[in-house]
Amino acid sequence: MATTHFDGTDTPTSGELPAVGDTLPDFTVVDTNLGEVSLSDLKGKKLVLNIFPSVDTGLCAESVRRFNAEAAGLDNTTVLCVSKDLPFALGRFCGAEGLDNVTAASAFRSTFGEDYGVVLEGSPLKGLLARSVIVADEDGKVIYTQLVDEIKTEPDYASAIKALG
């Protein structure tokens, strides 16, 4: 079990992020059109997983905006933004913001959070996903991970993008 922080208070997660060098566990999440997206659908491209608690918080919304801006300049890369928000909320947000360089998806009916070790086990956000970033190569091998130490801070965008090569 890993630990992040919420307002400086230790907040355990349901497990550990996949380690650098590991193959990503398969997953299925739901996109904003209620279609299923699985890891196998994304093979052959590099993958950035932007994982966060809820797009209805300012910092989470900013992470989706920032990765959308970064994704515009990335070749052969999918940026998948995953939370437990309902697909309708994610779609409304991305539509209102004009975010079309990322794919927003919901883990509301999957074991994504448990399989990736990112379900928050404590704090007022218990049950939501911990802010984290995972980058994988075209074969699904993990090349970068970050469990953000304080939920109320942004991920290290530059390091995640740099890991793509």
Swiss-Prot record:
Keywords, comma-separated and alphabetical: Antioxidant, Disulfide bond, Oxidoreductase, Peroxidase, Redox-active center
Residue ranges of domain Thioredoxin in the record: 18-165
Keyword Oxidoreductase attached: yes
Domain of life: Bacteria
EC class of the enzyme, as a word: oxidoreductase
HAMAP family listed in its UniProt record: Tpx (MF_00269)
Purpose: Thiol-specific peroxidase that catalyzes the reduction of hydrogen peroxide and organic hydroperoxides to water and alcohols, respectively. Plays a role in cell protection against oxidative stress by detoxifying peroxides.
Subunit structure and binding partners: Homodimer.
Entry protein name: Thiol peroxidase
Species this chain originates from: Corynebacterium efficiens (strain DSM 44549 / YS-314 / AJ 12310 / JCM 11189 / NBRC 100395)
